[in-house]
Amino acid sequence: MHFINEFINRGYFYQSTDLTRLTQISNSSQIVAYIGFDCTAQSLHVGNLMQIMILRLLQQCGHKSIVVIGGATTKIGDPSEKDKLRRIITNDEIQQNISGIKRSLQKFIKFDETKNDVLLLNNQEWLDSINYINFLRDYGRAFSVNKMLTMNSVKSRLERHTPLSFLEFNYMLLQAYDFYYLNKYYNCNLQIGGSDQWGNITMGVDLVKKLSNNEVFGLTTPLMTNSSGEKMGKTVNGAVWLNEDMCSPYNYFQYWGNIEDNDVIRFAKLYGEFSEIELSKLTELLFNNVNEAKKQIAYKITLLCHGRDEANKALNTAIQMFEHKKADENLPTFTIKDCNNLKVGIPITELLVTIGLAKTKSEGKRLIQGNGIRINNIKVNNINLVVQLQDFIGQVITVSLGKKCHILVKIAK
């Protein structure tokens, strides 16, 4: 399996420096590629999934890859696709986030220092020790401010007259230096990132060529949206996280089971590692039974992230909920510890906020008015409904938002 050919076939390709030469090198020798992740949260999410699948592909093709966690650059913040200065994250938060991100990645790839296992690095290791004056003297001359001002991440902010701090302006210099450092000490010759990173990546390519004259490349992936143009991994309830403590395997399964019909085959190629034969069968199934096709892709993608046991549980729960109208213990669960509240009763809008189906009581009210809320599969029409102890069947009720999001609410024993 040739890396670039498979990269293009799956739909990962957007833009590259000297694609012909990169293809030649990757077909004839081991490349060393790096992908970076900022550590702004305690888990990666579906929006990061394409980069993770690329790391898997590199490993499967026998190439070496490096994951760089931005322990240092996260303190600054990438201005790409941002309208305002990001909140400064503390060192303690960064360390917690790094631990969570590693857990996300370990679901998909193996870390080690053997021939083609993935190497995990934190750019804090080399950036924290940089002397500012020496950095300006040794590397500042290699960067053109004129060119930096034409980068989309900078240009768009200036055109919209939104503030761009000098702190953020330095981000692209540090990312470029990351590539130079990795090339010098780890023989890294390829940086891969999203299309919004093209300017930062090409600056790194230029820096390496100017300072060491080594042959390096940049490769970007498209910004992933669904058929409606919505960014991948975002829902009304926030990001779809990869770590199970932030998004249950069942909710992860439901996210993929709820994709649009037009996205099934595309997402199967991008995220499911379906073979050509499996894709052919899935295409035929999509034509005859779209729900079954979605169930298959949801199962396969959940299997990759959460393992067979959790994927089986999620599938069985979905079957019971939507085909047999039966709730199951594998649904996300919220436990009410103080049942005295239930003797008086809990307003439905308050309950929706408490269990996370609404962010505010006002939003809960709107969901009810839009016929979006059910309790034990019965539509809630009254925004003033009070949920009481007698509503619990066997000390459990199922609260549903639409057809796909369900939470078991239990009374503590």
UniProtKB/Swiss-Prot annotation:
GO molecular function, one term: ATP binding
Top-level EC class: ligase
Residue numbers covered by motif 'HIGH' region: 39-48
Gene Ontology CC terms, in alphabetical order: cytosol
Binding site for ATP: K234
Positions that bind L-tyrosine: Y34, Y171, Q175
UniProt keyword terms in alphabetical order: Aminoacyl-tRNA synthetase, ATP-binding, Cytoplasm, Ligase, Nucleotide-binding, Protein biosynthesis, RNA-binding
Motif ('KMSKS' region): 231-235
EC number: 6.1.1.1
Listed HAMAP family: Tyr_tRNA_synth_type1
Quaternary structure note: Homodimer.
Function comment: Catalyzes the attachment of tyrosine to tRNA(Tyr) in a two-step reaction: tyrosine is first activated by ATP to form Tyr-AMP and then transferred to the acceptor end of tRNA(Tyr).
Cross-referenced PANTHER family: TYROSINE--TRNA LIGASE, MITOCHONDRIAL, TYROSYL-TRNA SYNTHETASE
Similarity comment: family membership: Belongs to the class-I aminoacyl-tRNA synthetase family. TyrS type 1 subfamily.
Name the UniProt record assigns to this protein: Tyrosine--tRNA ligase
Gene symbol of the encoding locus: tyrS
